[in-house]
Regions:
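Acidic, amphipathic alpha-helical patches
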Residues: 20, 114, 155
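Donor nucleotide-activated moiety binding/catalytic core segment of transferases
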Residues: 133-174
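Conserved catalytic-core segment of nucleotide-activated headgroup transferases in glycan assembly
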Residues: 60-141, 212-214
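Active-site and donor-binding regions of nucleotide-sugar-utilizing enzymes
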Residues: 1-67
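Catalytic binding pocket for nucleotide-activated donors in carbohydrate/polymer assembly enzymes
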Residues: 142-144, 171-223
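Short, well-ordered beta-strand core segments
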Residues: 30, 165-166, 183
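Conserved acidic residues
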Residues: 28, 87, 163
Length: 223
């Protein structure tokens, strides 16, 4: 209920806010990993006092990110057919209300070509492309170094096998931060996202990693 734009062509902002308030009322308790999370989710769903519905328990799903072995990671890599010795990048873009394809489904906007990125990085890297569930499949061209892992059941497995995460405005940032591994924020459409789509909770300067807007900047940040 804190989104101030009308970016979704399927519904008005007031209708979106009603939906979010209705969803918030259905929840008895929210498990919360931090006071910051409680504050922002309370704002998003118009809950009011965060102390009423939020339990400071952490996310149960994140427990695995603190308890794992190198043997487990190796087995997960083998299950995903990741070649030995490759550096593994995980790309987890979020969805945009304003980006719809000809069938009315959400799609990623133009402006970033993962195939170009991988050509620039060279053969030492593998990219795991995890599309947001609102988008579905990643819809990338056949490329032996790009794996569409959108259907992998547990995103935790993808966090664990990766060496670095590339994201944009996705909340996967908060989960991945538990691993204390590097992140790069590829915000090639930052101006339009902030002004016309959903806005930002954090300013770019507060993010825990470099911000890039071109493939070359992203390559430099990864290296």
């Amino acid at each position: 209920c804190d989104i101030e734009t009308d970016s979704d062509p399927r519904q008005t902002r007031s209708h979106m806010h009603r939906r979010y308030r209705a969803k918030g009322k259905k929840v008895t308790f929210f498990p919360s990993p931090s006071p910051y999370y409680s504050e922002k989710i309370a704002s998003a769903f118009a809950i009011g006092d965060p102390s009423v519905k939020f339990v400071a328990s952490g996310y149960p799903r994140n427990d695995k990110l603190f308890h794992y072995t190198s043997e487990e990671i190796q087995k997960k890599k083998e299950a995903l057919h990741i070649p030995e010795g490759k550096k593994v990048l995980l790309y987890t873009p979020t969805w945009r209300d304003s980006s719809l394809d000809e069938n009315g489904a959400f799609s990623l906007p133009d402006g970033f070509d993962v195939n170009v990125l991988m050509d620039m990085l060279g053969s030492d890297y593998i990219l795991l492309f995890r599309a947001h569930h609102q988008i579905g499949a990643a819809k990338v061209k056949d490329n032996p170094v790009i794996y569409d892992v959108s259907d992998v059941e547990s995103v935790n497995d993808l966090y664990l096998v990766s060496d670095l995460m590339i994201t944009d405005y996705s909340s996967t940032m908060f989960d991945y931060a538990n691993l204390m591994r590097p992140m790069v924020f590829h915000m090639y459409d930052a101006d339009s996202y902030e002004q016309d789509v959903r806005g930002l909770y954090l300013s770019p300067e507060e993010l825990p990693g470099p911000i890039t807007k071109t493939e070359q900047e992203l390559v430099d940040a990864i290296h």
